[in-house]
């Protein structure tokens, strides 16, 4: 069993975009920013425990940080991990319910 403090550190924030909204409506999938070292099993356990929903599948990917210029200097944004969490049929999780 994964410790509760680790579960709280795994999930960072919901990722809100057009693609994420379409995935939620079409496939019942939520998109989350997660800790870079998080595993699929940890992400699944964290979502099930914190949001009390049943998870069917978890897909993850690493998003590479973009290079950004600040005048003459070139900086780089940090890499981060994105998780597509598919909920079981009949389950619902609404992050942006009243934001119309």
From Swiss-Prot:
GO terms for biological process: translation. InterPro entries: Nucleotide-bd_a/b_plait_sf, Ribosomal_uL23-like, Ribosomal_uL23/eL15/eS24_sf, Ribosomal_uL23_CS. GO terms for molecular function: rRNA binding; structural constituent of ribosome. Keywords: Ribonucleoprotein, Ribosomal protein, RNA-binding, rRNA-binding. GO terms for cellular component: ribonucleoprotein complex; ribosome. The keyword Nucleus does not apply. Belongs to the universal ribosomal protein uL23 family. Part of the 50S ribosomal subunit. Contacts protein L29, and trigger factor when it is bound to the ribosome. One of the early assembly proteins it binds 23S rRNA. One of the proteins that surrounds the polypeptide exit tunnel on the outside of the ribosome. Forms the main docking site for trigger factor binding to the ribosome. This is Large ribosomal subunit protein uL23. The gene is rplW.
């Amino acid at each position: 069993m994964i410790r509760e403090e680790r579960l709280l550190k795994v999930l960072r924030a919901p990722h809100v975009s057009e693609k994420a909204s379409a995935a939620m409506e079409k496939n019942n999938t939520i998109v989350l920013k997660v800790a870079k070292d998080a595993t699929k099993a940890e992400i699944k356990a964290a979502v099930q425990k914190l949001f009390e929903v049943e998870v069917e599948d978890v897909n993850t990917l690493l998003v590479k940080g973009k290079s950004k210029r600040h005048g003459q200097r070139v900086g780089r944004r940090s890499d981060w991990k994105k998780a597509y969490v598919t909920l079981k049929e009949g389950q619902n999780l609404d992050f942006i319910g009243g934001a119309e």
